[in-house]
Amino acid sequence: MEDEIQDXI
């Protein structure tokens, strides 16, 4: 899920 958070950067 952390990967998705980075994508939102």
From Swiss-Prot:
Other comments on record: On the 2D-gel the determined pI of this unknown protein is: 6.0, its MW is: 32 kDa.
Protein name from the UniProt record: Unknown protein from 2D-PAGE of fibroblasts
Lineage, broadest ranks: Eukaryota, Metazoa, Chordata, Craniata, Vertebrata
